[in-house]
Amino acid sequence: MDPNGDYLFRIRTVKAAPIRTLSEALKEILTEANIEIDQNGLKIMAMDGTHTVLVHLRLHADRFDEYKCPQKYILGINMINLFKLVKTMSNNDSLVMFMEKRDTTKMGIVILNGEKQMETTFNLNLIELDINPIEIPPVQFSAIITMPSLDFQKIIRDMGTLGETVEITSASNQLILKCRGDFAEQETVFSVGQGMTVSKSHSEIVQGNFLLKHLVLFTKCTSLCSDISIYLKNDYPIIIEYSVAGLGEIKLALAPAPSKQSHGGK
């Protein structure tokens, strides 16, 4: 492609693999979404079909290898179709996203492999999505836990085979996860140290029950970063934050499970 062509926007990054991972995770949560792109970066703010999960993605313009977007555009994207195009990207590939002035109904995607001197271009059809903007008021969380992303992934996936919900508690300097299934119960306690830190605004115990099937999907983001942040507040959605390989961050919010499912039985 011609880097000096007539584009409305053109973005390039050598971090193709994290974008592939991000696309794979998002397609499990959002079938369709509007991507807002402007001079500051890319943003997705959307809820899943059950109105249980909120996705807030922000990739910053100054973290890309090339970023040219003088004004704001809203791109309606089918996330499943997007992943079909980028799933073949390797760790050594570069990714370019663009829109040409002559055709604003498509987003261009170029996958570049310098080793093989190979360039593949796709043109993804955009869709019209009638989605109302989502505004999130500022919130002070009672506890913020930082821990290794692999540890969180393992415990959530293990519990996902046992029950339907997990009880997550932040008490003192511990993070406690409990799950109850038809054939067994599990409790795992993480204490401060070994990569885990806890920041609390006050000393109250913070506790909530959450559907494991959604948290399991969140863990598809695990390879994006070595550590995650967990934001907790009583009677409020849990938020799991992943860094997107230095490009930005994604926050995944999950509403508490309905009370009838709060004991985790299948």
Question: Where are the model-predicted features located?
Answer:
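DNA polymerase sliding clamps and clamp-related checkpoint/processivity subunits
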Residues: 1-27, 32-161, 169-266
